[in-house]
Amino acid sequence: MRLIPCLILAILFSCTFASAQQQNLVSGPMTGSIELRDVIVWAEVSAAAKKVAVRYWPQQQPGKALSQNWTGPLGNAYNPVKIQLRNLAPGTLYRYELLVDNISVRKSSFQTKTLWQYRMPAPDFTFLTGSCAYFNEEGFDRPGKPYGKDSSIFLTMTKEKADFMLWLGDNWYTREVDYHSAPGLAYRAHRDRSLPVLQPFLSAMPHYAIWDDHDFGPNDASKAYIFRDESREIFRDYWPNPTFGQDDKGIYTQFSFSDVDFFLLDGRYFSSGSRMPDSTGGQPNPEKKMYGDAQMEWLRNALLQSNARFKVIATGSQALNIYSRWDSFHHFPVEYCSFMNWLQEVNVPGIVFLTGDRHHSEVIRFDRPGNYPLYDITNSPLTSGEAAPSGNEVNSPIRVPGTLVVTQNYSRIKVFGPQNDRKMAVEFVDGKGQVLGKFEVRANDLKK
């Protein structure tokens, strides 16, 4: 009879131990950098965690499970980890579980890319975008009405059958208590990433990201920000992008999905800042740059190397809105004109811009003489306050009619169609799943 109390105690101990390991998972897991044969799994664990691993297997072959351990440091105040799984099979659905101290704390799945080149038509796919995710924190927010809105929009996004999410900057908002130290910046990333409303979304699909001023540092932060290198390290720790700039500078990178190449730009690390004058002595100011020479050289070469039908350039600030008095590429006139003139001279078809920042969504059409039009698809905000266009932007002649959305929303973007007529369809969707605006462009219409 003494066995029964012992068994009960053993069961209670086992449940308590498993619960403790669950608490050691702070946020995640999420995947990123999905490729044909590898993927990155990201998570954050508590300071009490001693060991982290990922166990994974093809869904149809659970007997072929493998494990990969995290070999980096643990036991710090914040412990984001990234584990790369290698030698996977292309076009395969995998199940995986995150193990903390040998206990399974969360399960999810990922699908490796299909090897379609020279074998089959480019696969159709859908992805989500969004920017400006402000999460309220009492005591550290601005006094008065909370700036952050309903964050249940992420629950709606979780239900989307999307292939990945592309975050377009201001993915969290640093506050005055965060700006002035590396630990402050790390706290903001850690705290906002760990919110319960985000966890299902993080695991639902792969994630890629760029930053803008508020997750880089203070409002309108530029290369003058003294913690820009520390901020870069935090961004690297919290996002599973494939790479982060070049020569240990910046966070720009590139990835591909089906027949689309994505060029993720860094508009902060190298930026002169919006407060530097556009002109000096009546001439465009050559010192004012948003991206810097090295990044622009990389972008030009990367675009020339691309054979993708759509070439998506993602950047935090609007690229083509010449009517905006806020952060926009045209306020950096020498760099802007140099790039736009280059685009006019070379034959690079299929360019589309994805941008955020503005606290409203819209599509800008930029017509060019003797060349195809450029489009700037702006999506904002996810949860921050909204802001309607003002001044010359109210009746902007370059805004595509029916695309202005001034409320919390995200983008659902589908690339589809036969190989000789690929299309990109954009929908702006609110937190209830209602479509508020639409836009579609054909790859065949993005040719010189």
What is each residue range found by the language model?
Residues 1-24:
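Bacterial Sec-dependent N-terminal signal peptides
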Residues 21-448:
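Metal-dependent phosphoester/phosphodiester hydrolase catalytic core
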